[in-house]
Amino acid sequence: MNRNTESHFSTTPTVDIPRSKFDRSFTNKTTFNAGDLIPFYCDATIMPGDTVKMNMASVVRMMTPIAPVMDNANLDVYFFFVPNRLLWKHWKQFMGENDTAPWKQTTEYEIPQIVAPENGWTKGSLADHMGYPTKIGGYKASALPFRAYAMIWNEWFRDQNLKNPCYISDGDSDITGVDILDPNYDYVTDTEKAAAPCKVAKYHDYFTSCLPEPQKGPSVTIPLGAAAPITFTENKEGINPTTYTYNSNAEGKELAYWQYPGNHDLGYIDTDNNNTLTSIGDMHYGKIAVDLSNAVGATVNQLRQAFAIQKFYEKQALYGTRYIEMIKGHFHVTNPDFRMQRPEYMGGMQIPINMNQVIQTDATSQQVSVKYEAGSPVWSMADKTPQGNAAAYSLTSDRHKDLFVHSFTEHGILMGLCCVRTVHTYQQGLNAQFSKKKFTDFYFPEFANLGNTAVLSKEIYLDGTADDEKVFGYQEAWATERYFPDIVTGEMRSNFDQTLDVWHWADNYTSRPNLSSEWIDETKENIQRTIAVQNHDQFFGDFFFQAIYTRPMPMFSVPGLIDHH
């Protein structure tokens, strides 16, 4: 029963808003490099009541390869939705919510703006990829898409063990943009200012999934009790030091000494002019001992707690400590993205990069060749190439239906992202199987659940120095028995004088790599050495988005129908 005497006044009338279907399909032709997280779709008009059905087709070409590369790379595609209320703390007040005074909002808000840098943004910047005009300075535009991009990277692409998060402001102030060419560019502070695209992390493997420490937390010690008695026993056998000779720098200097019990003296001795220190007579010393038979022992509960805390820290390292990851790891509960107030994943796909060979059918008088000196390519012309010489081109096409269908209940930004990554191959390390020396280095069922173990630096880069034995990172026990890295040998090695490393994308380090923020980034270098054109972006693509929007709008806006919903 309604508590109001007249229920009519306790309800509000509702109007069913008719919806119309709109074909908002379009293409985006762009260029980019491997390792960059490229925003190739940005729609900031998402409103409550929208339903979006997304299909996508793509054609991606690589700049001409020198040879038909025998390796693996993928184009990864992702779509996310970011509510505006997560990007700007006054979005709800902007829309009319009143939480400061009765009846109506007393403050009029405007969308935070970003001001183009003095000379404008240049090619390859976030602003460029999102469709903001380049090479024009001083104009203003919405800052929310760049906040959305930074939030997506923080929540979905940042390696939380090694990378600092991007700073994201949520206030009302306008900000000045930063260009990709700014020498002081820092992704932490400048991603929201439309500078360079952030880097994606390398695909996880034995090395790239290493942890910086065995557990995420301090080392857990085993409790041994609160106290134990200490006893002292004097030793009556004296020590009669001999005469010591010092160099000239000791002349006239003071030498401190401490005589142990029985003399209990503390003082100093002057050296003489002959630079000698003579005997100081008998010195007696004693022995200190801890009587553990009378020590207070640890309880079973204290020992249990130590093991439980250790297990907790190890799970923190294994699953991650973003709140959604922590809940999944410890409680095995999967929270939806919108519940966790984070960018919501819509859908995506992975497209293998194709490589096609071109067989030469006529001999030529010259051939382009490349070799590496100090890690840099040196190009030269050979006299002749025979028929059957293998060149290459890379053309990747894909059409994906029903990428996602989603209905939205609030205002926000729909953003599509793509990146190219290679599957990493290693050639400079010593596989751990060749370093086993003790029986404990071999697997036994009793050793199955040991803690995270050290991965030595020599496993990824060996140069015969003491640094080979340093710890690179930490990996689950017996990971070497579960994994085998991709390798290259023979003339494929990059350190061979006449190397054929233009045929693969294996890592080639000029110095010892460390598990660090820079190393975990996917970069363009491995692909760069295999392409003939060095001064352009590595990939250029044509992306077609078949975007069907069903929106709470009439099909046409007809002037005069001012009293109709």
Please provide the spans of the model-predicted regions:
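Intrinsically disordered, low-complexity segments
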Residues: 2-565
